[in-house]
From Swiss-Prot:
Residues at the active site: D832
Domain of life: Eukaryota
Disordered: annotated span: 1028-1052, 1077-1156, 1181-1212
Subcellular location: Membrane
Name used for this protein in its record: Receptor tyrosine-protein kinase erbB-3
SUPFAM superfamilies registered for this protein in UniProt: Growth factor receptor domain (SSF57184), L domain-like (SSF52058), Protein kinase-like (PK-like) (SSF56112)
Cytoplasmic-side positions: 663-1339
Organism field: Mus musculus
Catalytic activity of the protein: L-tyrosyl-[protein] + ATP = O-phospho-L-tyrosyl-[protein] + ADP + H(+)
One annotated GO biological process: positive regulation of cardiac muscle tissue development
Length: 1339
């Protein structure tokens, strides 16, 4: 550290001892506000400075040093460390201003409106006396204000000071010019910055040398040498107790932002409690109590209360409290700090009805006789009587001139206190001088002079002041504060009889008569001394309290020989003059006075005591009985009349309540109709050009004044979503809406104009997309949609996963696919499809949201940043991640992830993986793992959505068809393991929402618009609850179906080695050769060896696995027992035995208006056979046994369909078909990616004991009749090719019993597959397996 740094530290340590005692005991003295005006000569100025600032450390105000001589010893100023106002040094002759400990000038008041230090004209033109040095060696902080130092002929080194290091405000004005020249240079250790020539005069730098990490001051150049934020003027360490001065407040040596509050929060009781360590803010110091001449306002020591508060005395503490009603009037005084210098004719009317003078009162000769210079006329002496209402003066009272005919100051006869918070000249609070005609003071009510000195001089006729005991009036020693001289001698006053009244005590008096006594010798009555009180005789009778006579209440009866009362109230009388009502003496008994329960009537008894009348008396009484009532009717109200009156009254009340209810309901219905009118009505946008067609846009163009945002619901990649209200222009209704604010962060695009894409988004209307109510162009685009209080489907499935059943999940998948198909028809690419962007309109209807938003932004804003946390990488297709390519087929990929979220009840995809790792995993062929509740059929639909080749992925039309088919038999495709009681049907789904949530949704005004639809859905839910009655075993998923991957990973690898050697791992247990389960890369349910899709074929990995399983089983001929409790097992066999029924007419589809698919639960006994099916084959020929040979099984597995009835023709247009109904062939399903593959070998069923083969045959082959196919499938948009057909599978319901065990039949080996064909990242493999060409051959 350099030498200057060493000196800085030494300087700091030198003052540390005094700095540590900053908050414990500080000598605080008041400042002045005289400016350049002075009274008296240089000696008087010096004496004033000495008395004000001797041993002073903190100046509460301004330090003004003006017109001081050259021989003045100012060493008493060396203890001043802080000035709260400004420092003024002007017109002085001394050579050095010794303020070596001054550290901080706060600048709460600034000179000339902008300067905290003002130094000017400190020299004598007629001599060599002049100011040569400002010894401010410790000054390091000016909190407010600038610096002005000019025209000081001998003052040196001011231009060497770095004032920017001292001044805190960066733009403060600094003027330093025209000062002394030919000054000696700074000492070399000061490096050009000094207050004087010596090495001890170096400037201490505490800001410009600091490291950038420091916010304020520092004690060294290193980053760890920063001062505390509450420090001002530097520090010796980093703590708040190491500050040389405090920026805000000093609390016992520690710098704090505020003093301890009067109330503190108790964490145990959760309440605000009084703080036992409360302190008050007195200037920059926290004190335990304010000075006696200040008042407490909350936690501040103030000179006067604010205008809306009044001063009260609480437990000896003067406090400011809000006035109850009109406050005592406080008026501004005169003198320093006021706009008036004296009381004169121009301002005396402002003192009318004043009870308190805030400041001072000055009576000067220019005020009484007038001021011709300022054109102020003379004062009318009678107007001085306005001061008779004054009770307190907070400053000083200065009377230097008084009207000649007024011989005392009796206009101040009610003045009780002179506060002395601001003092005159040399510290006077009461100054009376040069009043030649005044004979007495007349301050008969004055009780206290809180601070300051008393100066009474040169009043030639003044008497009575000699007798006053000033110690009763003054706080502190009276000898040092009294300066009474040059008045009329005491002997002359006594000779003329101008002495105190004999009734006055030894305390003296203010003038002649018993009313001017400072205190009384005997008693006083209303301020006048008396010899005795009228206790036993005289009028009015009185009682005595602390030597004061107080009158009894007028209702007291005067007593002879004893006291009449013992207090001033009506309850303190010994005897009443008229009547007594309880303890009080009254002029008359109460008659009709309103009480808590009605009018009160009383009568006087024989002893003049007031007694209550009967409760039925309404006009008074003369006795306690009912017959004593005055004005009572002869016939009282009978009981029947009372009953009639009560009945009529209640009827009127009910009519009023009923009318109010009907009025409220009518207004509510009216508001609902208005809301429906605004929400359902679209707007036609007129063409801009005659050649353009009119565009029917359902959305509106809103004005910003019609929308009001309430709270933020969330934020995403493209903007922020707010909950708000729409107030249509000219209407009073408030419609709850969702407002999505889209902003262009680059600022290159504005949304002032309505584009074609905006109109295209506004024209979309579908049951399964969130309709856009309107948009508001501007600097940011605001999209307005209907507010759906049920929230997103993601939050819903997470909260209600225990109550959701397979029917709801599959129907939601259908509705999402239909909504996306509608967007595809209108060439709208979503780009951000995820479960969070699917909203729940009702418990059974969902809608896709946030579509078309990305196209509203410029191309650069749609580029993907893998590091951006909000970019939906996990939902995006590979071509979108790598190339930013977004198509309807990339939305299909996102749809697969959305369905995966739905089937995992809101799990996060690829949990635990960084976003940058996901593209590499997808390229390696790894995909999300099979959800636990999904069969292989549902999972394979997801896998097809995640194909690398986008052309191989299914379309939304095919996806809607596939999920519609699966929704007919939900337990067959989704197995949700959930505990159910014996009396609860396992297939009956509970409500996805609680009763309270449904009620809250119904209370939302926007949900009332779909009231009719919700009623239909409630009826539908009731039908579903009774219709879905399957055996308990159909909902039970075997525990053997578990993923081999860690649940936290959230994906499954798809590039694994083939399973060709899996069948070789066998073990011999109990003499039987049993197969060990092959190492699967995705869960395979037990009891399901083939695909459960209705097309009857298997995909690539499945076919490969089943071929090897078939080969192993055909060699070993094992008979492993398998459970038969899985509905998928029965439905698989049933698909081989059930004929495909013709397509039902569109009018018979079991689907409600919201896309909710009804499960096919109406069972029929039989149905007509169809050529090419296996319905006519007997059980013995279809179900293989152990004795059957392999040739028969092989022949069965290679059996082909003979033929099919002709398919219905393809509809001519989408309007003929409608997107709700997608066409399928009568015999072949247009399911996703189906192909005609080999039928599988059936599995032999070995019934358990007690079950006959006939019963089993009847149970397993039960199917519907022809009439049951009416609601089987929804019509699809186009017929598939013949090569892509597959057989139809139907759900069925058993009679309530089932075989407990099943055994696998011997399976014949199918066509072998090469290992190279089974790679999941080979598009040719998937294309050949899932989507065969037209010339593919069947086997």
């Amino acid at each position: 550290m350099s030498a200057i740094g060493t000196l800085q530290v030494l300087g700091f340590l030198l003052s540390l001892a005094r700095g540590s005692e900053m908050g414990n005991s500080q000598a605080v003295c008041p400042g002045t506000l005289n400016g350049l005006s002075v009274t008296g000569d240089a000696d008087n100025q010096y004496q004033t400075l000495y008395k004000l600032y001797e041993k002073c450390e903190v100046v509460m105000g301004n330090l003004e040093i003006v017109l001081t001589g050259h021989n003045a010893d100012l060493s008493f100023l060396q203890w001043i460390r802080e000035v709260t106002g400004y420092v003024l040094v002007a017109m002085n002759e001394f050579s050095v201003l010794p303020l070596p400990n001054l550290r901080v000038v706060r600048g709460t008041q600034v000179y000339d409106g902008k300067f905290a230090i003002f130094v000017m004209l400190n020299y004598n033109t007629n001599s060599s006396h002049a100011l040569r040095q400002l010894r401010f060696t410790q000054l390091t902080e000016i909190l407010l204000g600038g610096v002005y130092i000019e025209k000081n002929d001998k003052l040196c080194h001011m231009d060497t000071i770095d004032w920017r290091d001292i001044v805190r405000v960066p733009d403060a004005e600094i003027v330093v010019k025209n000062n002394g020249g030919n000054c000696p240079p700074c000492h070399e250790v000061c490096k050009g910055r000094c207050w004087g020539p010596g090495p001890e005069d170096c400037q201490i730098l505490t800001k410009t040398i600091c490291a950038p990490q420091c916010n304020g001051r520092c004690f060294g150049p290193n980053p760890n040498q920063c001062c505390h934020d509450e420090c001002a003027g530097g520090c010796s360490g980093p703590q708040d107790t190491d500050c040389f001065a405090c920026r805000h407040f000093n609390d016992s040596g520690a710098c704090v932002p505020r003093c301890p509050a009067p109330l503190v929060y108790n964490k145990l009781t959760f309440q605000l409690e009084p703080n036992p360590h409360i302190k008050y803010q007195y200037g920059g110091v926290c004190v335990a109590s304010c000075p006696h001449n200040f008042v407490v306002d909350q936690t501040f020591c103030v000179r006067a209360c604010p205008a809306d508060k009044m001063e009260v005395d609480k437990n000896g503490l003067k406090m400011c409290e809000p006035c109850r009603g009109l406050c005592p009037k406080a008026c501004e005084g005169t003198g320093s700090g006021s706009r008036y210098q004296t009381v004169d004719s121009s301002n005396i009317d402002g003192f009318v009805n004043c009870t308190k003078i805030l400041g001072n009162l000055d009576f000067l000769i220019t005020g009484l006789n007038g001021d011709p210079w300022h054109k102020i006329p003379a004062l009318d002496p009678e107007k001085l009587n306005v001061f008779r209402t004054v009770r307190e003066i907070t400053g000083y009272l200065n009377i230097q001139s008084w009207p000649p005919h007024m011989h005392n100051f009796s206009v101040f006869s009610n003045l009780t206190t002179i506060g002395g918070r601001s003092l005159y000249n040399r510290g006077f609070s009461l100054l009376i001088m040069k009043n030649l005609n005044v004979t007495s003071l007349g301050f008969r009510s004055l009780k206290e002079i809180s601070a300051g000195r008393v100066y009474i001089s040169a009043n030639q006729q003044l008497c009575y002041h000699h007798s006053l005991n000033w110690t009763r009036l003054l706080r502190g020693p009276a000898e040092e504060r009294l300066d009474i001289k040059y008045n009329r001698p005491l002997g002359e006053c006594v000779a003329e009889g101008k002495v105190c009244d004999p009734l006055c005590s030894s305390g003296g008096c203010w003038g002649p008569g018993p009313g001017q006594c400072l205190s009384c010798r005997n008693y006083s009555r209303e301020g006048v001394c008396v010899t005795h009180c009228n206790v036993l005789q005289g009028e009015p009778r009185e009682f005595v309290h602390e030597a004061h006579c107080f009158s009894c209440h007028p209702e007291c009866q005067p007593m002879e020989g004893t006291s009449t009362c013992n207090g001033s109230g009506s309850d303190a009388c010994a005897r009443c003059a008229h009547f007594r009502d309880g303890p009080h003496c009254v002029n008359s008994c109460p008659h009709g006075i309103l009480g808590a329960k009605g009018p009160i009537y009383k009568y006087p008894d024989a002893q003049n005591e007031c007694r209550p009348c009967h409760e039925n008396c309404t006009q008074g009484c003369k006795g306690p009985e009912l017959q004593d009532c005055l004005g009572q009717a002869e016939v009282l109200m009978s009981k029947p009349h009372l009953v009639i009156a009560v009945t009529v009254g209640l009827t009127v009340i009910f009519l009023i309540l009923g009318g109010s209810f009907l009025y409220w309901r009518g207004r509510r219905i009216q508001n609902k109709r208005a809301m429906r009118r605004y929400l359902e009505r679209g707007e036609s946008i007129e063409p801009l050009d005659p050649s353009e067609k009119a565009n029917k846009v359902l959305a509106r163009i809103f004005k910003e004044t019609e929308l009001r945002k309430l709270k933020v619901l969330g934020s995403g990649v493209f903007g922020t979503v707010h909950k708000g209200i729409w107030i249509p222009e000219g209407e009073s209704i408030k419609i709850p809406v969702c407002i999505k604010v889209i902003e262009d962060k680059s600022g290159r695009q504005s949304f002032q104009a309505v584009t074609d894409h905006m109109l295209a988004v506004g024209s979309l209307d579908h049951a399964h997309i969130v309709r856009l109510l309107g948009l508001c162009p501007g600097s940011s685009l605001q999209l307005v949609t209907q507010y759906l209080p049920l929230g997103s489907l993601l939050d819903h499935v997470r909260q209600h996963r225990e109550t959701l059943g397979p029917q709801l999940l599959l129907n939601w998948g259908v509705q999402i696919a239909k909504g996306m198909y509608y967007l595809e028809e209108h060439s709208m690419v979503h780009r951000d499809l995820a479960l969070r962007n699917v909203m729940l309109k009702s418990p059974s209807q969902v809608q896709v949201a946030d579509f078309g938003v990305a196209d509203l932004l410029p191309p650069d804003d749609k580029q993907l940043l893998h590091s951006e946390a909000k970019t939906p990488i996990k939902w995006m297709a590979l071509e979108s991640i790598h190339f930013g390519k977004y198509t309807h087929q990339s939305d299909v990929w996102s749809y697969g992830v959305t369905v995966w979220e739905l089937m995992t009840f809101g799990a996060e995809p690829y949990a635990g993986l960084r976003l940058a790792e996901i593209p590499d995993l997808l390229e390696k062929g790894e995909r999300l793992a099979q959800p636990q509740i999904c069969t292989i059929d549902v999972y394979m639909v997801m896998v097809k959505c995640w194909m690398i080749d986008e052309n191989i992925r299914p379309t939304f039309k095919e996806l809607a068809n596939e999920f519609t088919r699966m929704a007919r038999d939900p337990p067959r495709y989704l197995v949700i393991k959930r505990a159910s009681g014996p009396g609860i049907p396992p297939a009956a789904e509970p409500s996805a929402l609680s009763t309270k949530e449904l009620q809250d949704a119904e209370l939302e005004p926007d949900l009332d618009l779909d009231l009719d639809v919700e009623v239909e859905e409630e009826g539908l839910a009731t039908t579903l609850g009774s219709a879905l009655s399957l055996p308990t075993g159909t909902l039970t998923r075997p525990r053997g179906s578990q993923s081999l991957l860690s649940p936290s990973s959230g994906y499954m690898p798809m590039n694994q080695s083939n399973l060709g050697e899996a069948c070789l791992d066998s073990a011999v247990l109990g003499g039987r050769e049993q197969f060990s389960r092959p190492i699967s890369l995705h869960p395979i349910p037990r009891g399901r060896q083939t695909s459960e899709s209705s097309e009857g074929h298997v995909t690539g990995s499945e076919a490969e696995l089943q071929e090897r399983v078939s080969m192993c089983r055909s060699r070993s001929r094992s008979r492993s027992p398998r459970p038969r409790g899985d509905s998928a097992y029965h439905s698989q066999r049933h698909s081989l035995l059930t004929p495909v029924t013709p397509l039902s007419p569109p009018g018979l589809e079991e689907e409600d208006g919201n896309g909710y698919v009804m499960p096919d639960t109406h069972l029929r006994g039989t149905s007509s056979s169809r050529e090419g099916t296996l319905s006519s084959v007997g059980l013995s020929s279809v179900l293989g046994t152990e004795e059957e040979d392999e040739d028969e099984e092989y022949e069965y597995m290679n059996r082909k369909r003979r033929g099919s009835p002709a398919r219905p023709p393809r509809p001519g247009s989408l309007e003929e078909l409608g997107y709700e109904y997608m066409d399928v062939g009568s015999d072949l399903s247009a399911s996703l990616g189906s192909t005609q593959s080999c039928p599988l070998h059936p599995m032999a069923i070995v019934p358990s004991a007690g079950t006959t083969p006939d019963e089993d045959y009847e149970y397993m082959n039960r199917r519907r009749g022809a009439g049951g196919s009416g609601g089987d499938y929804a019509a699809m948009g186009a017929c598939p090719a013949a090569e892509q057909g597959y057989e139809e599978m139907r759900a069925f319901q058993g009679p309530g019993h089932q075989a407990p065990h099943v055994r696998y039949a011997r399976l014949k080996t199918l066509r072998s597959l090469e290992a190279t064909d089974s790679a999941f990242d080979n598009p040719d493999y998937w294309h050949s397996r899932l989507f065969p060409k037209a010339n593919a051959q069947r086997i």
